[in-house]
Amino acid sequence: MKITSVKAYQVDLPYVGGTYYWGKGNAIRVAPTTVMVVETDAGLSGCGESCPIGGNYLAAYPEGVIPALARLAPAVIGQDPRHIHRIERLMDEALTGHPYAKTAIDAAC
């Protein structure tokens, strides 16, 4: 089995409680999320997601997920998604850091 494509979809997920608050008066009503779909030549697909909520909470921004995935996708296409340690190594070689983007592919595999 080999990965044939990596697709990303952006969606704003509303908080069930209305507003999410954290330190320094920060609040958001939706979580900007990227849903990742990894497709294989066996007709199987896997899904993962990345939902960073900004630099006041984590060192990650939702706007950075798609560009990071553009660097990561070519590294994993053609690979067997069941060999997750190899996938992780290839992602690390393709892009330093950005675990918030790598986790979506990791979960999808």
Kindly give the residue locations of the regions a language model identified:
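Structured beta-strand/loop patches that form or line metal/cofactor-binding pockets in enzymes
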Residues: 1-47, 51-56
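Metal- or metallocofactor-binding catalytic centers and their adjacent structured scaffolds
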Residues: 5, 39-109
